[in-house]
């Protein structure tokens, strides 16, 4: 399953036409006029090679100009930064041997031009009143804002449910880490719930881009719900990664799991470097302590790294005296006391079943 946000070409095109942008204002004007239109954004020289005839405009772009020029039958060619209208009423002559799945003349041309040049091509259907964006081999149909809002709100509700389940799993893991009772199952469960949250988040992030200026509220809700989940996911990998696989590589492997594979917790165990046999899921394992230590306010990453490297695991850090903590590079007596008190306070919060 390809993450929409990983497709940089379409992401760039989508941001360019998101609500609130000058280009989207012009496209909306054309939609309301029901004239249809074909707009090419000349991001490279290949575009100009297939432009024939028309009028050389070379004027500053404005939504009203786009609306007026779209009344003519030909294509409108804009500069790569959408600051200038280069040509109007132009004929586009792409290679007609390029395959296209479209039926209408305007959209067949748009798809061929996009495939041949890699440029962003926008087709506005006169009858269906729909905006379609093409870039390379990709195609995207722009949905109505109200529909996107409905989908975004539904996704936010789903995320709230997933996040509640994740928070319960993390709270449980916190208690187990402080009491040195963590098993592979506990870690795999948290990893699974985190990935489920991240997948819903990716969908909402796509909606936020589609909503443009209108998506501010959805974006704020998303950030509020997510909290430190993105950081915690990386730190859990650092805490329990048995084979010291690169974190980015590990995250990529988790992201590439399909829905059926994600349900099976043994797959998470395998990614961490454990056997993956269901009977070994109850095997006790120890955390390195990156995630818990990161919760101590204003404790630098370099100090956390020194602590983890000095002690074998988090339990040893937890049991260490102030004098033993003081021996770690970069930690003086004041900071050692601060770390010790911070860990004691967090352990008390965990016993009270509170989030840290």
Swiss-Prot record:
InterPro entries: DisA (IPR050338), DisA_sf (IPR038331), DNA_integrity_DisA_N_sf (IPR036888), DNA_integrity_scan_DisA_link (IPR018906), DNA_integrity_scan_DisA_N (IPR003390), DNA_integrity_scanning_protein (IPR023763), RuvA_2-like (IPR010994). Keywords: ATP-binding, DNA damage, DNA repair, DNA-binding, Magnesium, Nucleotide-binding, Nucleotidyltransferase, Transferase. Participates in a DNA-damage check-point that is active prior to asymmetric division when DNA is damaged. DisA forms globular foci that rapidly scan along the chromosomes during sporulation, searching for lesions. When a lesion is present, DisA pauses at the lesion site. This triggers a cellular response that culminates in a temporary block in sporulation initiation. Also has diadenylate cyclase activity, catalyzing the condensation of 2 ATP molecules into cyclic di-AMP (c-di-AMP). c-di-AMP acts as a signaling molecule that couples DNA integrity with progression of sporulation. The rise in c-di-AMP level generated by DisA while scanning the chromosome, operates as a positive signal that advances sporulation; upon encountering a lesion, the DisA focus arrests at the damaged site and halts c-di-AMP synthesis. Residues 7-147 form the DAC domain. It catalyses: 2 ATP = 3',3'-c-di-AMP + 2 diphosphate. One of its GO terms (molecular function) is adenylate cyclase activity. This is DNA integrity scanning protein DisA. Homooctamer. Belongs to the DisA family. ATP binds at residues 74, 92, 105-109. GO terms for biological process: DNA repair. Its cofactor is Mg(2+). Pfam families: DAC (PF02457), DisA-linker (PF10635). HAMAP family: DisA (MF_01438). Its EC number is 2.7.7.85. PANTHER family: DIADENYLATE CYCLASE, DNA INTEGRITY SCANNING PROTEIN DISA. The keyword Cell division does not apply.
